[in-house]
Amino acid sequence: MSSDTSSSRPPQPDSGTASKSESENPAIPSPKPKAHAPLTNRDWWPDQVDVSSLHPHSPLSNPLGDDFDYAAEFAKLDVEALKADMISLMTTSQDWWPADYGHYGGLFIRMSWHAAGTYRIHDGRGGAGQGMQRFAPLNSWPDNASLDKARRLLWPIKKKYGNKISWADLITYAGNVALESMGFKTFGFGFGREDVWEPEEILWGEEEEWLGTDKRYSGERELAQPYGATTMGLIYVNPEGPEGKPDPIAAAIDIRETFGRMAMNDEETAALIVGGHSFGKTHGAGDADLVGPEPEAAPIEQQGLGWKSSYGTGSGKDAITSGLEVVWTPTPTKWDNSFLETLYGYEWELTKSPAGAWQFTAKDGAGAGTIPDPFGGAGRAPTMLVTDISLRESPIYADITRRWLDHPEELADAFAKAWYKLLHRDMGPISRYLGPWVAEPQLWQDPVPAVDHELVDDNDVAALKKKVLDSGLSIPQLVKTAWSAAASYRNTDKRGGANGGRLRLQPQRSWEVNEPSELDKVLPVLEKIQQDFNASASGGKKISLADLIVLAGSAAVEKAAKDAGYEISVHFAPGRTDASQESTDVESFAVLEPRADGFRNYIRPGEKAPLEQLLIERAYLLGVTGPEMTVLVGGLRALGANHGSSKHGVFTDRPGALTNDFFVNLLDMGTEWKASETAENVYEGRDRASGALKWTATANDLVFGSNSVLRGLVEVYAQDDAHGKFVEDFVAAWVKVMNSDRFDLK
């Protein structure tokens, strides 16, 4: 049925409740930060770099200890018994939080979706991989109202199976089981998410109040990076429309932007909304002012539960979560095509929920009584969210959803794959997945081939190192190439890294930070060494270019250490393979391109953020600590590994030798630093007595002398007895970065 003007863009009334999200976000009062006198160093000096951000999840906070092996514990788990217990849980309604329609499936789908849906592509943060929904701020986000009850319902399962199943896996798996228990065939499931035990500081937005939007947009509604959501405290978008204005077309624009930032294309986006909204309901039975504070602000006697409502019984038929009161289909506990049949089967008019939230109801009383009440009351009229109507009104989504209306099997396939991607997007390569239900590799998992040949041995490694060092390539060239390959790694979502050899492929081959013109000189030489070895090696031995790039860089580090008077062997573990261009999603990889890399003293033209802050961010994404960051920067400067062979920060008269000169000369009080009058982002270090120019630097360099924490680390490596320690620590940090994506070694 084609839509008429009643379901096109409605008039723009004042927002009833602007505090909503996709699909259950509260109209209830949201938390606001309480003002207080400065209590921390960060309060006093907010512009100082926060080195402590490089040390999240201290092992001191982990009650399971350093020796705990989750994969080994999981191997003891009877996954079929777990699944059976969870299916039983789905249909065992509890008096303290009754199940809609006698089935918790809709609630658990929302819990899993909101755990995974925090993932964002621009920095890889968020996602379900660590069970962060248990902690602030996520446990108290307006969008996560009532999910405290969902997690509490899971406690008997967690209690029974103990350390064999993590909270992170259990929270995520619950939604998968919910779908299967209601007749949907999922694409698979991978376990393997390890719990953390304390929250992590993540910049979710700069707004000073939850549900704000004023600090994340500029220009014509341009959403700042790296944010994924339109609104502070929401997972995706406001289901009443942008800022609570019920405009389905404008909402579709927000949907496309925010789901795209979660790595979903248009079809995946539509599939997730249609599939997710085929089950359950939203909750807005009464006045939202009767709902109490979120878990982090709730009274101690509520024991971690929040949003206690005094409206009626406060639960069941009286539940208030989002302020929206929508049941999407006549079969809310069964998979079928009734969401689209309902969406296209009626014309829609704008109405308000009992809590005053904007939603749509079938026009002129059509369909009255066809939607079942969750607790046996009178039948209801069909209802939809503003963002549901977007799927019909937006030409982009209408083309997709109208096709699925006639071909429900295509919807089922698209939803199964999009749901699998949603739950696993932050887990990295498939080698990290556990359990019997892991699906075949997908392009978005950045697949690499399995090793199908004998690996090089110690004698081969020694011979290859000699060939590399005799090739005419310089130490800086070899070091920079290896760093370019490995430093694409993001510890947040476990993407990038040297494995796969994608430095030779697009888009990484063309990234400015990787100096394409230099790669054009280095890679052909290494490829020739690889080809010659593979053609002549006996016993089926081969070396991948991915392995050789790392080996060549490590050989250069050994040579540089020797030139500085220190003999050391850099550990090398073969086993990387070379991916193909066909198995590399160019658009997906593009978001890994660094806006800055302080380790190479690189900044993208036009970047305005402080360099020292970007250095900390790059170190965080690499997963290195403050001491590791310090020793790596000092060592890479000594090796001459700057982007474009810049001399900034190369505080040595013997570049290419692995010395601690960077630290010694940075602390030299005979040097006075001033901002350059001719070059942006550059500082000049001049002799205090003569005024002669000695060095140039950027904030990436000088922060190590300016910041008190970093200066303390620099002092360790600048001491007269520190050269040996410096080399050993640099090599250890180097190997860590080179092996960041070698999950087979961990």
Curated annotation (Swiss-Prot):
Recorded GO MF terms: catalase activity; heme binding; metal ion binding
Specify whether DNA-binding is a keyword of the entry. Answer: no
Active site: which residues? Answer: 114
Residues that hold heme b according to the record: 277
Q: Which family does it belong to?
A: Belongs to the peroxidase family. Peroxidase/catalase subfamily.
Query: How are cofactors bound according to the entry's free-text note?
Result: Binds 1 heme b (iron(II)-protoporphyrin IX) group per dimer.
Top-level class of the enzyme under EC nomenclature: oxidoreductase
Record's protein name: Catalase-peroxidase
PANTHER family referenced in this protein's UniProt entry, alphabetically: CATALASE-PEROXIDASE (PTHR30555:SF0), HYDROPEROXIDASE I, BIFUNCTIONAL CATALASE-PEROXIDASE (PTHR30555)
Q: Would I find Oxidoreductase among this entry's keywords?
A: yes
InterPro entries from the xrefs? Catalase_peroxidase (IPR000763), Haem_peroxidase (IPR002016), Haem_peroxidase_sf (IPR010255), Peroxidases_AS (IPR019794), Peroxidases_heam-ligand_BS (IPR019793)
Q: Which residues are listed under the site Transition state stabilizer?
A: 110
Give the span(s) annotated as Disordered.
1-42
What are its GO cellular component terms? cytosol
Q: Which lineage do the record's taxonomy fields give for this organism?
A: Bacteria, Bacillati, Actinomycetota, Actinomycetes, Mycobacteriales
- What does its PTM field state? Formation of the three residue Trp-Tyr-Met cross-link is important for the catalase, but not the peroxidase activity of the enzyme.
Compositionally biased tracts (Polar residues) = 1-20
Tell me which cofactor or cofactors this protein depends on: heme b
Please provide an example of a Pfam family that matches this protein in its UniProt record: peroxidase
Keywords recorded for this protein, A-Z:
Heme, Hydrogen peroxide, Iron, Metal-binding, Oxidoreductase, Peroxidase
Whose protein is this, by species? Mycobacterium intracellulare
Q: Which NCBIfam families match?
A: cat_per_HPI, PRK15061.1
Enzyme Commission (EC) number:
1.11.1.21
Subunit description:
Homodimer or homotetramer.
Crosslink feature (Tryptophyl-tyrosyl-methioninium (Tyr-Met) (with W-113)) location: 236-262
